């Protein structure tokens, strides 16, 4: 992934992901499971439903230590079957 994030960020730094996916009960657990593999810690994600209730957005903040960690998490979070978008 070619990004300029490395030029913009100074590591270690807090980094928030916003993951949007289908409103399924397992969404939060799947997001936390992926994050735990690359940035172990205690997480309390914020969950917001869409106006029609079909989707949920899950915001989770990690303490990023390097750009590869940030990029890998973008890719792996996006690979979750019920995830539609990662910001």
UniProtKB/Swiss-Prot annotation:
Annotated protein name in UniProt: UPF0250 protein ESA_02696
Cystine connections: none
UniProt record similarity statement: Belongs to the UPF0250 family.
Any single Gene Ontology cellular-component annotation: cytosol
Superkingdom assignment: Bacteria
Listed InterPro entries: UPF0250_YbeD-like, YbeD-like_sf
Organism of origin: Cronobacter sakazakii (strain ATCC BAA-894) (Enterobacter sakazakii)
């Amino acid at each position: 992934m070619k990004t300029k994030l490395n030029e913009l960020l100074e590591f270690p730094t807090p980094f928030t992901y916003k993951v949007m996916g289908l409103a399924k009960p397992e969404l939060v657990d799947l997001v936390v499971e992926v994050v735990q593999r690359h940035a172990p810690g205690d997480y309390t994600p914020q969950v917001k439903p869409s106006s029609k209730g079909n989707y949920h957005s899950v915001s989770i903040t990690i303490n990023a230590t390097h750009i590869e960690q940030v990029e890998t998490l973008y890719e792996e979070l996006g690979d979750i079957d019920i995830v539609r978008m990662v910001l």
